[in-house]
């Protein structure tokens, strides 16, 4: 079982893969989950729009699409992250790009752990959980 990082049509972001993978595992454990096979696919806005249209029938850009293959307490999935939208969100929300990237990385893991963000009040709960996870992000990743 592994956490893997790929770049689809862009360059892989400069993240500390080993430290980030350890952080992901630590966050998952706080929800009573173990990590299975998790693939991060970093891509452009155009690629994530293509994935959104093809698999979800959504015609818009987004920062992350999570395909959940979780079985029991072992989380697994493919997570597409648009680095273009991450950059736009960092500018929009006046946050550091690196922080926004790690927020997006953990956002997908939180979905795999069962946290939603579409219903009433769920977005706030998701943000609280993201903030809790970011608080334990290893210093070398900041």
From Swiss-Prot:
InterPro entries in UniProt: MetalPrtase_cat_dom_sf_prd, YbeY
A biological process term (GO) from this entry: rRNA processing
Main localization of the protein described in the UniProt heading: cytoplasm
This protein's source sits in the domain of life called: Bacteria
**Binding of Zn(2+): at which residues?**
107, 111, 117
Q: Could you state one GO cellular component term attached to this entry?
A: cytoplasm
The record, for Pfam families, names: YbeY
The family annotation for this protein states: Belongs to the endoribonuclease YbeY family.
Role noted for this protein: Single strand-specific metallo-endoribonuclease involved in late-stage 70S ribosome quality control and in maturation of the 3' terminus of the 16S rRNA.
Q: What is this protein called?
A: Endoribonuclease YbeY
């Amino acid at each position: 079982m592994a956490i893997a990082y790929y770049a689809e049509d862009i360059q892989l972001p400069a993240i500390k893969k080993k430290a980030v993978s350890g952080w992901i595992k630590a966050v998952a454990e706080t929800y009573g989950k173990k990590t299975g096979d998790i693939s991060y696919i970093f891509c452009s806005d155009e690629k994530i729009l293509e994935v959104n249209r093809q698999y979800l029938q959504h015609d818009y850009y987004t920062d992350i699409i999570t395909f959940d293959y979780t079985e029991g307490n072992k989380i697994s999935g493919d997570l597409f992250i648009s680095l273009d939208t991450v950059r736009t969100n960092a500018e929009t929300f006046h946050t550091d790009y690196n922080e926004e990237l790690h927020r997006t990385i953990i956002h997908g893991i939180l979905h795999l752990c069962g946290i939603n963000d579409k219903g009433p009040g769920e977005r706030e709960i998701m943000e609280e959980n993201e903030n809790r996870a970011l608080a334990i992000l290893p210093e070398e990743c900041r």
